Amino acid sequence: MRLYDDELKIYYEIKEAQGDTYIVISDADKKLNGIDIPEEIEGRPVRHIAKKAFLGCKGLRHVSIPGTVRSVGEWAFAFCDNLTRVEMQRGRIELGKGVFKNDLNLREMDVYDEGTEEPDRIMVSHLMAAAPVIMDAEYLLDTLHCGEDEWLGKWDTKLSHILSLKDNDGYHLYVLCGEEDFHFDYEEYLEYNREKKSSLCMLRLVNDIALKEEDKEPLRDYLRDHTSGCESEAAIRMLLKRHGDDRDYYRMMLDIGAINDGNLEAVLNMMGDRHAQMKAYLIEECGKKKADFFDDLLL
């Protein structure tokens, strides 16, 4: 029998197997804007989130999944357009196929435990969120080993593979088979892939946990080759689209020379009347760099 929790705004079922009585969350109010799933409902542990339970909850922004949950079904949180943050306790959770499909605004997937340093945990949460959304790499949704050296190596290997692909890779399949979520002509398809690569390069350089110096340079090169003034300005477009007011990303782009005195005006024009604080920051920092340059000449 399906029951409804008026406070949580979810539907659930009470199941029993091998002497264990537990809760399965089966559906949710589509107007839900956030939920901290409890460890127990009616004194019974929440063990499973069913297939498509939160599918299409357009207003859902954050989800917290307790450590009692053992599995999350296919497409459970798919097409949640505004989902930005997911919290899960570190442990072995079975995540179904397409569990976060098309959640394009997902930015953090925080897998927490008591032993992880806060800065590392934050960086890993950003890398985890990119796995299903940008990288199409659901095998990286490893809630037990994420953040470990081997997992980070797999993440970086996937990034290297993505960067090695030609921008038109897969276009013939896209044309033949179609893709319900995207509609591109050839040039738009090329730019889409450049934007994806730029976004991942920025993400990894800012969240540089265990990233070796020699592995940073190809990422920097890619961003410098796709900044304002280049044939493709994908890096600046994604900077503004995904990180419009995040100073850490602007600082990184300044540090690597992807934003500089030569293209500052063009970048500011692309920003239009948005991101006023970041515009002021860029103007100030480029001014400092110019002053430092002339000071060095006088020495």
Where is each model-derived feature located?
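Short amphipathic alpha-helical segments and helix-helix/interface helices
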Residues: 96-100, 250, 279
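Ankyrin-repeat intra-repeat helix-capping/turn positions
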Residues: 244-245, 274
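Short amphipathic alpha-helical interaction segments
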Residues: 71, 245-248
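Structural signature of tandem-repeat unit edges
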Residues: 2-23, 29-48, 58-71, 81-94, ...
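Charge-dense, extended regions
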Residues: 252, 257-258, 266-299
